[in-house]
Amino acid sequence: MKIYKVDKTLVSTNRIAMMEHKPLLVVREKDGGTPQVAVDPVGCKPGDWVICCGSSAARDATGVKGYPSDLTIVGIIDKWEVPQDADTTS
Amino acid sequence: MKIYKVDKTLVSTNRIAMMEHKPLLVVREKDGGTPQVAVDPVGCKPGDWVICCGSSAARDATGVKGYPSDLTIVGIIDKWEVPQDADTTS
Amino acid sequence: MKIYKVDKTLVSTNRIAMMEHKPLLVVREKDGGTPQVAVDPVGCKPGDWVICCGSSAARDATGVKGYPSDLTIVGIIDKWEVPQDADTTS
Amino acid sequence: MKIYKVDKTLVSTNRIAMMEHKPLLVVREKDGGTPQVAVDPVGCKPGDWVICCGSSAARDATGVKGYPSDLTIVGIIDKWEVPQDADTTS
Amino acid sequence: MKIYKVDKTLVSTNRIAMMEHKPLLVVREKDGGTPQVAVDPVGCKPGDWVICCGSSAARDATGVKGYPSDLTIVGIIDKWEVPQDADTTS
């Protein structure tokens, strides 16, 4: 699993029907990193550091069998020290 | 899921039979980025910013059980601010 | 799916039995790029630009249930303009 | 499989229910490398060099059918010479 | 599939029970490249150039249903010319 910081909620105009039941969040490995989109079954808020599961396990981790996710939040980290190589400008 | 910009429709001379029922689009993570090919079950047009699902979930997300996709568009983003590190020259 | 150029046929001395029934081609994302090996159920020739499917979908895309592939050619592209960032020296 | 060095135990405030039964460790490919999170069914301690399995195989490797992992420790390496390109400052 | 050179046998002190029945080899994409660990159901020796299958197909390719592998050797290449960009110093 990788560690991401929650950036914000993602608003999409038109999703496939299978995706309609879960919030999608924009997450980044570090501030300024490439944005990715994760399914959030945990209930996170911007600024949280979270553990995300990818690969085929991301599907069941949503709690909905067969949900089409390749990145799902599976936990919130209590205290996370940003690694030295990460950007800490925000 | 990752975020891509739709570039154009991809025309292929000869596809395997399993792939014949869905449009294929060329998508890029940013203008000038490496082109990838995504299955489009949503109905996108060039210039749209879209959410794409990879891994094994890309298959069912096409809406056709067992479709051989490793990248499928699952949503169109309403408004997307291009991240600062992306190329915006086009 | 990603786009590759077919380089040549790959000859292997000793394959696992499950792999014996399909041709393997060396493909590259661009001239001079890292060589990868794709299963070819379509019938390609060197110089063709092809669409390759990875992940778990690469298996069924071979046309043989349970074939052990992680990269399978699923279509030949009619006309492909090499992106500007690609090496065109060959 | 890739080779990682165990850094420390990861404490998360709120995990999905499916993840509650196994310890999670922070692992890195080399000292100072990007931290990743692996499920540990073997029983490792900080400083151990371990083999981690990703992809869909990471799930069953936890020993719990359907566990939502994309990175699971599957073995401890007896003696591992750090490759020359790795950082050895710690 | 990717192409690797076999480096050496990997000795691990403690493996999960599911992994005990197959040899593990350290492989590299080129001399000096990052070491990875592949399951070897073919019978390779150090110096061999091999084809490795990843993703979910790596599991069945071991010949043991449900084996927890994400990288499995599926063939030995007869003659492999090292690409120009590879390090040939060893």
Curated annotation (Swiss-Prot), chains A, B, C, D, E:
Which keywords does this Swiss-Prot/TrEMBL entry list? Bacterial microcompartment, Carbon dioxide fixation, Carboxysome
Its main localization is other
Give the comment on domains.
The tight homopentamer forms a pore with an opening of about 3.5 Angstroms in diameter which is positively charged.
- A Pfam family of the record is EutN_CcmL
Q: Name one GO cellular component term.
A: carboxysome
What does the UniProt induction comment state?
Induced by growth in low levels of dissolved inorganic carbon (at protein level).
Which family does the similarity line name?
Answer: Belongs to the CcmL/EutN family. CsoS4 subfamily.
The cross-references to PANTHER family, in alphabetical order and at most eight, read:
BACTERIAL MICROCOMPARTMENT SHELL VERTEX PROTEIN EUTN, ETHANOLAMINE UTILIZATION PROTEIN EUTN
User: Its Gene Ontology biological processes?
Assistant: carbon fixation
Please report the name of this protein according to its UniProt entry. Carboxysome shell vertex protein CsoS4A
Oligomeric state and interaction partners are given as:
Homopentamer.
Origin superkingdom: Bacteria
Which InterPro entries has this protein been placed in? CsoS4A, EutN_CcmL, EutN_CcmL_sf
Q: Which residues form the BMV domain?
A: 1-78
Q: What does this protein do?
A: Probably forms vertices in the carboxysome, a polyhedral inclusion where RuBisCO (ribulose bisphosphate carboxylase, cbbL-cbbS) is sequestered. Has been modeled to induce curvature upon insertion into an otherwise flat hexagonal layer of major carboxysome subunits.
Localization terms from the record: Carboxysome
